[in-house]
A protein has these predicted regions:
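Generic, ordered loop/turn and secondary-structure boundary motif
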Residues: 12, 62-63, 82-83, 151-156, ...
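Short C-terminal domain-edge/linker segments immediately following a structured domain
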Residues: 34-36, 60-61, 84-85, 113, ...
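Helix N-cap/coil-helix junction residues
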Residues: 24, 171-173, 195
Length: 204
């Protein structure tokens, strides 16, 4: 299998954590790329042009980080990260909340870089920031439900928190100030799970 990836994307990191958790590193070749390069191999067969993108051993292409993560989870031998028990929907719901935070963040980051900072756009960006602040605090209020078990929701929330620290100068939110207990929880998860610690974002 081949995974087209970057070292900074929280979506890619989600997939890399799954790979590390299931010790699939020897089965997945990492192909570093930049999504915007039109002649990158992953863009030749990837209509979305996004990363991560996974090419299976059968030559089939899989798109979307959650789909790729679930596919790799199905191949793994360790504890499943997509639980099928009574907490199935709760885990997926927390994952969806983390996904919403990233959608809000990427929306205003893109607009901030592309558009002038008129009063209207500034107001729109501030609205997205305030939504993220509310959502981080919501997650902090539900730490008991999140627990310390590694699953697709908890690992993705850690990815989001670490991405906010990594891009804090652009995002403008410090999780340690906004939701300190949630931030400490994320750092503890990093210390406890090697698959998280070894995949932290960095600029290659």
């Amino acid at each position: 299998m081949k995974l087209w990836y970057s070292t900074t994307s929280p979506f890619v990191r989600k997939v890399r954590v799954v790979i590390a958790h299931h010790q699939l590193n020897g089965q997945v070749e990492l192909m570093a790329t930049v999504a915007v390069k039109p002649y990158s191999p992953h863009n030749q067969d990837n209509p979305l042009g996004r990363i991560p993108a996974l090419q299976t051993d059968q030559g089939e292409w899989l798109f979307n980080s959650t789909l790729i993560a679930e596919y790799l989870d199905s191949l793994g031998k360790n504890t499943p990260l997509f639980p099928q028990g009574e907490n199935h929907w709760q885990v997926l719901n927390f994952h969806a909340i983390a996904d919403g935070i990233m959608e809000n963040t990427l929306m205003y980051l893109g607009e901030r870089m592309l558009r002038d900072q008129s009063e209207w756009w500034h107001s729109r960006h501030q609205q997205m920031i305030e939504r993220n602040i509310r959502t981080l605090r919501y997650l902090e209020q539900h730490l008991d439900q999140l627990g310390n078990e590694l699953n697709i929701a908890t690992l993705y929330i850690v990815c989001v928190i670490d991405f906010f620290h990594f891009r804090q100068n652009v995002i403008g939110i410090d999780p340690a100030d906004i939701a300190p207990r949630l931030d400490r929880w994320a750092q503890e998860m990093n210390r406890h799970y090697t698959c998280l610690a070894d995949t932290k974002p960095y600029q290659a």
